[in-house]
A protein has these predicted regions:
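Alpha-helical scaffold/interaction cores of sigma-54-like transcription cofactors
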Residues: 2-283
Length: 283
């Protein structure tokens, strides 16, 4: 494995665009179809006639969206959100800077009239600050998997993947794991973890800080230092645990993240299939 690692040469193209391509009707491209969908959406939102200031805002946003190359992004997001609504899946009304877009309101991505509520489009997409648009989308968690299945069928399972997460070994886990693999009784791990200072904001003191006088919580760790100073076995467990802290312990799947790509994901990043259900996940 070392030989293989030394032969690997990886370069990331950070400027490449892998946004999924939205399938448009014959004779249309993403830009022309977005313009038509927005016009149809405005008529739906304003059945008594589209006010001039609303149309002006929508036209301005379309110019920005098209010039920045994001028509497909809006079409893709609108498609799976509206599919969810049409299939009785609860969808949030809109959250974050995306709620400031009139185009998003017309496409039913959001359900908040941005002009009525004084929301600003430029917080979401600004030609002077080139960055990807980012809609915060909320689905009923009980049926979220149906939306993922929909986009997987539409764009292909080789282009849709879940995102891996890695759990790291924290302070208490490192102590307990070390005690266990060193064939120490369960009480050894318990006594060490109970001697630690109380967690602050759900975070335990790092093991390296326990013996570092310059560390901010060094003084609170006096009982722990006393324990390892008087018990050679506890000291050995502690030293072993320092080598484990921060290492990856297990992998999981991100609760909300899904990647959609215009090319097979395997051509861009390493992936794997979960044994239980065959779900594709990034590595």
């Amino acid at each position: 494995t070392l030989l293989i690692a030394e032969r690997c040469e990886v370069e990331f193209d950070t400027k490449a665009n892998y946004m999924p391509v939205f399938p448009t009707p014959e004779g249309e491209d993403e830009t022309s179809w977005l313009i038509k969908e927005v016009a149809s959406g405005l008529a739906y939102r304003y059945p008594d006639g589209v006010p001039d200031h609303v149309r002006k805002q929508a036209d301005y946003e379309l110019d920005v969206i098209i010039s920045m190359g994001f028509p497909g992004y809006f079409l893709v997001v609108a498609d799976f959100i509206n599919w969810a609504k049409e299939n009785g899946i609860r969808v949030g009304p809109g959250r974050g800077s995306g709620a400031g877009s009139m185009v998003a309101y017309a496409l039913r991505i959001t359900d908040l009239d941005p002009l009525k509520h004084g929301l600003i489009f430029e917080r979401f997409l600004n030609p002077d600050r080139v960055s990807m648009p980012d809609f915060d989308v909320d689905f009923d968690d009980r049926r979220r998997s149906e939306v993922i299945d929909y986009v997987t069928r539409k764009y292909g399972d080789e282009r849709v993947t879940m995102i891996v997460t890695y759990g790291t070994i924290k302070t208490k886990q490192a102590l307990k794991d070390s005690a266990r693999v060193m064939d120490q009784p369960f009480s050894m791990g318990e006594s060490l973890t109970k001697a630690l200072p109380p967690a602050v904001m759900a975070k335990d003191i790092p093991l390296k800080d326990i013996e570092d006088p310059a560390a901010p919580r060094y003084g609170e760790a006096a009982p722990f230092r006393e324990l390892i100073a008087t018990d050679p076995v506890a000291k050995e467990v502690f030293e072993t645990a320092k080598g484990l802290e921060g290492l990856k312990r297990q992998w999981g799947v991100h609760a909300a993240g899904v990647i959609m790509s215009s090319v097979p994901v395997i051509d861009v990043i390493p992936i794997m299939r979960r044994l239980q259900d065959g779900q594709v996940i990034t590595q």
